[in-house]
């Protein structure tokens, strides 16, 4: 009775254009799903620093993440090129949403739909900023090394030809785009706390971190202070911290 004909909620046939707010939401769902890849926040992005910093141990070499533990930086190792491929795939999916919205392909028929579409656009901008930020942290020097003059990663804000080979931007140029995207996203996003989707406070929290990595202490402080004083989030107490790892959401999310 139609059970096998249910339309997927995270993908759409490539030959069909994005024309409705529902289509844009499906595309956004797919972008969020990509964030949970084991090559991104589903595993490796969360353990990368701990593996290299000595907080984690690898009892048996030869497993998938041992290269991180031993600092075996080789371009052909899955541990390293998978970050690059996955994060640029996230950027591609974000750009697909943003390009279709900018070109007027997504039609709204009510004020409510227009508000939802702005929300989707804001989330896509924030996700693109997050992916560029993470790429630059993984493959570029810290901003404070030389005020962002070193090579970072390619800034990609449009849908590229499959065979395109964009050149690397400087770290400063990457940060400029990240900040532009986040400042554009913030007014489009709601302030209400919601689980599973980014809101205005999440964008401001990320912006505060970007300013911190950049060494822009005043903006980092003021932006973080704005998030804290919103009252929507509180740090776990010492008593609740351990138990929080068993919960999907909490006072900090």
Annotate each language-model stretch with its function:
Residues 1-50:
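Membrane-proximal, proline-rich intrinsically disordered regions
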Residues 21-22, 26, 173, 214-215, ...:
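Extended ligand-binding clefts on enzyme/binding-domain cores
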Residues 28, 91-94, 133, 175, ...:
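Inward-facing hydrophobic residues that define packing positions of alpha-helical scaffold repeats
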Residues 64-139, 169, 187-190:
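Conserved, well-structured interaction surfaces
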Residues 108-115, 138-172, 176:
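Short coil/linker segments at helix-helix boundaries
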Residues 136-143, 193, 213-215:
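Short coil/turn linking the two alpha-helices of tandem helical-hairpin repeats
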């Amino acid at each position: 009775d139609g059970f096998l004909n249910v339309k997927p909620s995270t993908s759409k046939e490539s030959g069909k254009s994005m024309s409705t707010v529902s289509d844009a939401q499906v595309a956004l769902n797919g972008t969020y799903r990509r964030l949970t890849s084991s090559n991104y926040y589903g595993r490796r992005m969360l353990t990368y620093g701990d593996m290299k910093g000595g907080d984690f141990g690898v009892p048996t070499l030869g497993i998938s993440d041992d290269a991180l533990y031993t600092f075996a930086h080789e371009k052909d190792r899955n541990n390293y090129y998978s970050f690059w491929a996955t994060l640029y795939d996230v950027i591609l999916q974000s750009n697909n949403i943003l390009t279709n919205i900018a070109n007027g392909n997504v039609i709204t028929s009510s004020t409510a739909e227009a508000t939802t579409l702005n929300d989707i656009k804001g989330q896509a901008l924030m996700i693109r900023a997050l992916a560029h930020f993470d790429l630059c942290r993984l493959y570029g020097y810290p901003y404070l090394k030389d005020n962002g003059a070193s090579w970072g990663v390619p800034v990609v804000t449009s849908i590229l030809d499959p065979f395109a080979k964009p050149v690397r931007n400087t770290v400063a140029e990457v940060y400029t785009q990240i900040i532009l995207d986040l400042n554009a996203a913030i007014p489009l996003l709601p302030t209400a706390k919601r689980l599973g989707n980014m809101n205005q406070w999440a964008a401001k929290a990320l912006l505060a971190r970007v300013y911190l990595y950049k060494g822009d202490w005043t903006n980092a402080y003021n932006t973080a202070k704005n998030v804290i004083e919103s009252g929507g989030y509180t740090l776990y107490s010492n008593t609740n911290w351990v138990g929080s790892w068993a919960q999907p959401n909490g006072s900090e999310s």
